[in-house]
């Protein structure tokens, strides 16, 4: 497939993990297993938070939508990735690439905002318990979830507007396993200035700012926890927040390193491994850290099993 600098291209080649040779087979089965666990685990959380009245609180409302976004986020990437791992020359049509890019940005930014909303919910519950019902009214938590989805739509649309109008000729090899904005921009044959400005705007507004808000929320939570008189009280509060904090660090940490590395070092194997962590591994962790460390969720699971499996 030779490059023709005068011809508009109709598809991209996703280089992906082609340099891993025989390890691609192991990677295929590993990613497939992780994807199945992600779908089952997050679907279980959605089911539990809908079916059990004890989980009809703002915290689990956020968790349900977070699980839905995790399912959609991974599904945007993994099925195509699995098909490409079994292909000798993985290609993706231009329209499919832009569609993947749009939904990748949409669900990724929605996840960032939902994590921020969940941090605010924990802040309100732990630091302002007497005012929690006022701070986290039904209008507030539904509005925060709606705003998270809206932010994702704005992000995806912003990326799309800047990229869909660019011409692509000649080079068509994307050094990645998905269509992300920066690798695609590098292939455009026109100025990408506004595309990079748009990406910077989205990164600052929907990634850096949410991360700073989460850090501020947990700083306040930490101060409150240290002020609790009994060690049992501290342990309970730490247990409540540790699972959320784990997901936040894993997601924002790897994503930040991947996007903030120097351009000369980007789009190599290290960048792809980092992306693999926050797009594939993190969504799998969500149901485990929230269910195995949360007595209310495990209790709801037991009640659901008793009602439908062990009941009369």
Curated annotation (Swiss-Prot):
CDD domains: 7tmA_OR10A-like (cd15225). It is a multi-pass membrane protein. Glycans are attached at residue 5. It is found in: Cell membrane. GO terms for biological process: G protein-coupled receptor signaling pathway; sensory perception of smell. GO terms for cellular component: membrane; plasma membrane. Residues 1-26, 79-89, 165-205, 258-271 are extracellular. Pfam families: 7tm_4 (PF13853). The chain crosses the membrane at residues 27-47, 58-78, 90-110, 144-164, 206-226, 237-257, 272-292. Keywords: Cell membrane, G-protein coupled receptor, Glycoprotein, Membrane, Olfaction, Receptor, Sensory transduction, Transducer, Transmembrane, Transmembrane helix. GO terms for molecular function: G protein-coupled receptor activity; olfactory receptor activity. Residues 48-57, 111-143, 227-236, 293-312 are cytoplasmic. Its main location: membrane. InterPro entries: GPCR_Rhodpsn, GPCR_Rhodpsn_7TM, Olfact_rcpt. Belongs to the G-protein coupled receptor 1 family. PANTHER family: OLFACTORY RECEPTOR. Odorant receptor. This is Olfactory receptor 10P22. It comes from Mus musculus.
